[in-house]
Amino acid sequence: MRRLCTIGHTKKPLEHFINLLRQSGVDLVIDVRLNNTSQLAGFSKRDDMAFLLREGFGIEYLHLPELAPTQEMLDDYSTTKDWEMYEAKFRELIVERDMTHLVLDHASDYDTPCLLCSEDDPTKCHRRLLAEALAASLPDLEVLNLR
C-alpha cells in the first residue's frame, strides 16, 4: 500500500462517487462507519455498496466497524459539537484498538485502499484522523482525500 484515499458519500451523486474511486485507482473500499445500513443515499447502504463496487467496478468492499467511533462518542459529539474532545477521544481509540495494524492487516495486499465514511468534508471526520495515524506509521504513504 503506497497510497491511501478517503471519501465521504454525502453530497455526491453516484456517478461522481464512482468516478472519484476509479480515477484514483482505488481497489479496496474500507467502510469505517459504525452504522452503515440506514443512510439516506441508497447506494451507501452496506449491501448495496458491496454489490455495486464488486460487481460493477471490480472494487473490493470491507466493512470494519472496529475503525468507527463508539456510539457514545457519536452521541456526545452530536450533543456538544466539541470537535477537540471528539478528536482526542478518537485518537485514544485508535491506539486502544490498534486500528493502524487492523487496516494494514486487511489492506496490505491492495495498491490503493480507501476509507469510506459519510462526511463529505474530511476535516471533521474520524477517517482523516485514522489516515493521519496510518501516515505517521508509514512515512512513504500518500494520503488523498477525494472530494
Question: Where are these predicted regions, by residue range?
Answer:
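Residues lining hydrophobic/aromatic ligand-binding pockets adjacent to catalytic sites
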Residues: 1-147
